[in-house]
């Protein structure tokens, strides 16, 4: 048996039912999972839903539902997508599950102990619907409101304290690993 191979779809935001983009990403991931299995790799293929954030909260409020109840309903449609498309995923994870929280807590504790994360602040123009930050040159003022030039979605200025991973510390080792593998 060849080396292990891990593949995942994005963990989708269940702010609305799945669409063609979700199907496309899932099918591409499934293709590579099946290919690697045929090539003799031990494959673990994961998909699931990421159930947090402003977009989820706003979608739940718009539906007059509790965010978890809203996610329960929409997440089920993503799980059904796997069956409908006959995907070969080994697991479906929801970020609201205890097993996910436990794994994240364990990883967090390891990173904190090794001083790989730090508390800092970030700020910028953020679009909830696009789930993206934009630079000043990527937004415009339309009738007194700031919007993204590329999507037309409203943006709002946000400033938050958050934890960050020291990715730049790992740049050279990662580039070396990629070039060798």
Predicted regions and their residues:
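N-terminal, positively charged nucleic-acid-binding surface of large information/translation enzymes
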Residues: 1-181
């Amino acid at each position: 048996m060849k080396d292990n191979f891990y593949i995942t779809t994005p963990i989708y935001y269940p702010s609305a039912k799945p669409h063609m983009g979700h199907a496309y990403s899932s099918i591409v991931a499934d293709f590579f999972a099946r290919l690697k299995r045929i090539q003799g790799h031990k494959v673990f293929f994961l998909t699931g839903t990421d159930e947090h954030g402003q977009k989820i909260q706003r979608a739940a409020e718009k539906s007059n539902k509790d965010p978890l109840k809203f996610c329960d309903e929409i997440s089920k449609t993503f799980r059904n997508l796997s069956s409908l498309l006959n995907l070969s995923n080994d697991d479906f994870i929801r970020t609201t599950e205890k097993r996910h929280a436990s794994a994240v807590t364990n990883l967090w504790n390891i990173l904190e102990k090794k001083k790989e994360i730090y508390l800092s602040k970030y700020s910028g123009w953020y679009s909830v619907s696009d789930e993206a930050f934009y630079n000043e040159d990527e937004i415009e003022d339309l009738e007194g409101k700031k919007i993204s030039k590329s999507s037309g979605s409203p943006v709002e200025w946000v400033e938050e304290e958050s934890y960050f991973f020291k990715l730049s510390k790992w740049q050279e080792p990662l580039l070396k690993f990629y070039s060798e593998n």
